Structures are given as structure tokens and as C-alpha cells.
Amino acid sequence: KQKLGDKANQHIIATTDQNKGNLIKIAKQEGFPTFYIPDGVGGRFSEFCPVGLLPAAVLGIDIKLMLQGAKDMDQMCRTDDISKNPALFASLLMHVAMETGHNISVMMPYADSLRLISDWYCQLWAESLGKSVDYDGKLVYAGQTPVKALGVTDQHSQVQLYTEGPFDKVIILLAVNNFRATVDIPHGFADIPDVNFLCGSTMNKLINTEMEATEYALTKAGRLNMRITLDSVDEYSLGQLLYFFMLHTAYSGAMLNINTYNQPGVEEGKKATYAMFGKQGYEAKKQELDSAPKKDQKYII
């Protein structure tokens, strides 16, 4: 406003709930163009509504191709035939894994361009499945802890734990057949066998070979793992991948008989924060916090 004055609202677009929340009040007051979030869609499931599509479009991403990928994955996953429904098949396998004590899920893409998928997956999987009670009101303490890794970087750190540590993990390898660029490995040091054997190959082949080698090592050690392969990292494939994981999460929550779409544990922390700041309407929560047992000084260093 300091620079643009009354024209400032022409440079801001709001994405918000249509009826409630502070942002819709501000958007109406300031006259911001507004896109609305559909009712009942949580942030972690919002990639295919304006929350995800608007910033993607602004960045020049072809959102029509993303939606086509999601649509095709949806069609593929409508069958009751488990062998032909990838999201349902993956959910069944993961459910069996959880039932047998594999309570950690590692997301390990072998492409830098997919590394942020792991961050989103961690929120999606943890916030959706980490629930203390099921639909019957029974205490179940459900969930599987998501961990992010990056190939090949974390082969030299985390994979040691995955191959020789506790049998409590499922490792998901994200592979790419065709990278956006080909990086040649030049010839040189022909007299050094430990270097020369790579000459004339490509970094593309090296990355995928290391992924296959890691997959082999995990399997040889009896560690549960699965591989998901994208033909390339493009809008269509990402649309398929994002939709797959959202549906995979929904199926998994149904198998656990829990509410996949709420986050009461997160809300409790928000309420406590509001109370600590003295927000109106949270006086009872403030009293609860004030009456809670204090930290014992002898345990504070």
C-alpha cells in the first residue's frame, strides 16, 4: 500500500474458506480477488484445489496436465481388484507391515526434484494416521512414523540403520526413468581402475544403479521396501503421484478404522498457544494451563 496505494489489492490474490476465517474478512475488506477452498478439504489433501493449483499455475506449471494425471490415477484406482488398484494394493501391504511391527515409513526419492515430496508425505502420513482412538471409541494409538531421506545422499548415512538396525521400517524408493537432463561422466584417469570403470557412462545411470543396488541390499537383509517409478518428473506424473499418495492414505485410514481427515493433536497445541497469548475465548484453557503441574527444577540443567 505504501507504494501502490489503492491499486495494491490488484496485486494480491487470496485463497481461503468462503464463509469463515480471518482471511476472507480481510479479502472482502480489501477487495482482493479470491479463490475458495472446498468445504472439508484439509491442507494436506488440498493439492488439487486452489490451495495447490493456484501457486503451481503462477509458477508456470501446466495444472491441466497435473489434473489429467490425477484423473487417470483415480480411474485406475476405482476397481475392487486389488492387483489392478495400486493405491489399494500399497495400503494393504502397508497395513500388514504395521500389523507386524513396522511402525516407521521412509520416503526416499532418487531425484533432487522430488525431495520436497518427502516433506509433504511426512505431513500427509503422520497427521492423517496418527490417531489415539478409532471410530468405535477404542484406544488404538494408530500410526506409522514417516521419515524423509534422499538418494543417493542418505545411502551414506541412514541406509546403514535401515539395513542393519531394527526390523521396524518400510523404505519407499521413488525412482525416475528419464531425468530432465543427461550428465555425461567424462573419460580420464584410465590408469586408475576404481575411477575408469565409470568413464563414458552417465550420472543418470549411476543414480539409478545405486538405487537398484540399495534395493537389493535392503531385500537381501530382509528389510521391507517398495519401489515407485515415474517415467519422468513432469506435471502428469506428479499429478498421478500426489493423487496416489492421498488415496493410499485414505485407504490406510479406513483399514485402521480411524478418522483420516482430522488432527485433534495439532488443534490442542493451537488452543494452548492461543490461551498463552490471552486470546479471547480461551480463558478456560488458560486456567487449565496455569493449574498444570510445574516443571521440577532438579531436572532442569
Predicted regions and their residues:
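Active-site phosphate/pyrophosphate-binding segments
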Residues: 3-172, 177-180, 265-301
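Generic alpha-helix detector with strongest preference for long hydrophobic helices that associate
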Residues: 8, 35, 47, 54, ...
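Conserved aromatic-histidine-acidic binding/catalytic patches
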Residues: 109, 113, 146, 202, ...
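N-proximal short alpha-helices
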Residues: 39, 87-90, 94, 98, ...
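C-terminal helical cap and adjacent loop that interface with cofactors, partners, or active-site loops
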Residues: 214-277
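Helicase-primase coupling helices
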Residues: 147-234
